[in-house]
């Protein structure tokens, strides 16, 4: 009887593996949205922290870099997730990030800020290493769509985050924003309850040495793409409120402008991966890599109301490449999804850290607007590297 039923059970497993499991995807992307809402507090609070603690732009940039530092652990976290499943990190991360980011105003000095942001960085790393692999497994044959929804949820969180932080700043003041953390605690509780109904998945692996040549060919161009793209998106994503407030904008206007940019990224994230499922990863990634720096140049050259539509296009194209690259990694490393994503996230966060500090140094020496010009120039170097990405395997294993 076992021999007779075995083929049908295998067929059921294949169908299940190829199916887009919306309920599981929604659970994970909800966690991503809530987590990234709180992790997006730094940029809108940065002008006030600079004023309160008399920070230089270089010190301000280092704060963003501190949150990225724990990303060095991402490959290890990804490796462990492939072995034993670490979804508890996905459950706890919203509560941890909500607590630390709502307490930034309590910091009496630069060192305390560093400690709080390092804890936030640990939460970010622990969340972002396993969660994309969870999305890929739940997305079946439509990994691009799953990654688009995942990234869109994060971008939506980074859209709401500046607005929530600006509201909290005006309502409670910088040193009394702690009540804003409460929804994050309830979110972790709700995610825990929802995850109880989802079975634990541990990846069935081949040896990592077998896929190492593929990983090398893939990550060689990706490292360059991530590095130069990091400067392009960090300028607007981290320093836009500081630039605008330095030029006379109000707290609310600066926060709203950042939210507009991030919301455009939500749309870009949804479209990027989904379109790449149909047209191919490389063509879509190449197109957005060409258009994104052009839009940043446009933002710097326009003034008044014209900056808004240009900023929307900058967010649309600049933030749409992440789900495409995540899908590329998942396509090439189907038997090592978490560790592949861990390496990708580690490289991404390290490059974002370098970019944040680099732009801060340029801002101190040349001014932020001139620093933004250099970020746009760096973005022009991305598109040639896209051409070096190896072709996606014709047959992708569905895990």
What are these language model-derived features?
Residues 54, 85, 106-111, 140, ...:
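Helix-breaking motifs and short loop linkers at transmembrane-helix boundaries and internal kinks
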Residues 334-365:
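A late C-terminal transmembrane helix in Major Facilitator Superfamily
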Residues 116-153:
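Cytoplasmic helix-loop-helix junction between adjacent transmembrane helices
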Residues 72-111:
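Conserved MFS/SLC helix-loop-helix module at the cytosolic interface between two early adjacent transmembrane helices
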Residues 141, 150-196:
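Helix-loop-helix hairpin linking two adjacent transmembrane segments in secondary transporters
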Residues 65-78, 259-271:
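Central cavity-lining transmembrane alpha-helices of secondary-active solute carriers
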Residues 42-43, 217-269:
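Extracytoplasmic gate region of multi-pass secondary transporters
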Residues 276-325:
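C-terminal transmembrane helical hairpin of 12-TM major facilitator-type secondary transporters
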């Amino acid at each position: 009887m076992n021999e007779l039923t075995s083929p049908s059970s295998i067929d059921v497993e294949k169908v299940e593996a190829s199916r887009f499991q919306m309920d599981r995807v929604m659970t994970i992307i909800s966690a991503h949205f809530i987590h990234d809402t709180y992790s997006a507090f730094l940029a809108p609070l940065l002008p006030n922290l600079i004023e309160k603690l008399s920070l230089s732009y270089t010190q301000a940039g280092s704060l963003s870099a501190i949150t990225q530092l724990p990303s060095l652990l991402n490959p290890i976290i990804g490796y462990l997730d492939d072995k034993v499943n670490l979804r508890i990190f996905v459950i706890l991360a919203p509560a941890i990030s909500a607590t630390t980011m709502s307490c930034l105003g309590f910091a009496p000095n630069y060192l305390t800020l560093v400690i709080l942001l390092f804890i936030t960085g640990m939460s970010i790393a622990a969340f972002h290493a396993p969660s994309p692999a969870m999305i890929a497994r739940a997305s079946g044959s439509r990994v691009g769509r799953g990654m688009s929804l995942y990234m869109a949820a994060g971008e939506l969180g980074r859209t709401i985050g500046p607005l929530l932080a600006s509201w909290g700043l005006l309502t409670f003041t910088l040193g009394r924003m702690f009540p804003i953390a409460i929804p994050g605690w309830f979110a972790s509780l709700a995610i825990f309850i929802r995850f109880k109904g989802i079975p634990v998945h541990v990846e069935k692996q081949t040896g990592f040495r077998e896929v190492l040549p593929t990983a090398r060919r893939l990550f060689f161009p990706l490292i360059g793409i991530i590095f130069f793209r990091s400067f392009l998106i960090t300028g607007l994503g981290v320093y836009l409120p500081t630039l605008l407030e330095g030029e006379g904008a109000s707290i609310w206007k600066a926060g709203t402008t950042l939210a507009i940019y991030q919301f455009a990224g939500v749309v870009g994230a949804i479209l990027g991966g989904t379109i790449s499922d149909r047209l191919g990863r490389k063509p879509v990634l190449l197109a957005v890599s060409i258009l994104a720096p052009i839009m940043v140049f446009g933002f710097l050259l326009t003034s008044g109301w014209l900056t808004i539509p240009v900023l929307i296009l900058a967010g649309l194209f600049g933030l749409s490449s992440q789900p495409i690259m995540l899908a590329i990694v998942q396509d090439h490393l189907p038997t090592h999804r978490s560790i592949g994503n861990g390496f990708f996230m580690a490289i991404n966060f390290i490059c974002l850290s370098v970019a944040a500090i680099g732009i801060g140094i340029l801002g101190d020496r040349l001014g932020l607007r001139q620093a933004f010009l250099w970020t746009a120039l760096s973005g022009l170097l991305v598109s040639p590297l896209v051409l070096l990405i190896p072709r996606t395997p014709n047959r992708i294993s569905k895990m």
